[in-house]
Amino acid sequence: VSKINDTGIIFDIKDDKLVSLVSSLDSTLILHSEYKSDFQFNTSLNIPDVKKLRHVLDTIEEESLEIDINSNNLEYSGNGVKFKYHLYEEGFITKPNINLEKINGFKFDVEFNLNKATIQRLFKGSTFASETNKIYFYTDGESLMGELTDRARHNTDNFTLSLGKADFKLEPIALNLDNLRLLSLLNDEIRVKINTEYGVVVFDIEENNIKLRYIISALTQ
């Protein structure tokens, strides 16, 4: 979460899940995250600074911990560590203006899997195609391709990588490469879904009790 936006985040605890919805500063990337645990209560936590909270939690060496949730703060005492972290008041933070139900109800024209190693190879290729910050996904025959270039500019160095076999057709769809860098590669396998009508690309990542859904708006060519 803190990779995308680390200030002013609401975490909702409901139905045994810790849920958050955050967006990048330019709103081209939305992250909906779920962490499933054995919560026995419902509440909302208005966190002023996620990175600051994460740093203090990193000082705790226990694998599991119990944090007291008070009316305006989080409090911990144990294993030689004590801290009190103050929360924002209810209503101080607003959630991103996005209709998740609408997006979840989209018909996705194209779906495919990407693995962590392939994405990391694309990132390595970006050091060569350093003049652009765009990545294009498209099909060439029976192959899915990822191309780092800028089709709106001339004489731009480009790097193209075959991402695997494709049993579908996909016209070039462009994304901001920086948004891909913000993906948390928890699992080796990432499910990618594309709605070409609205130019929306979804990256689903699951690992044990964690679900991450990244929603990225496509760029103009």
Residue ranges, per PLM feature:
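DNA polymerase processivity clamps
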Residues: V1-H86, K107-Q221
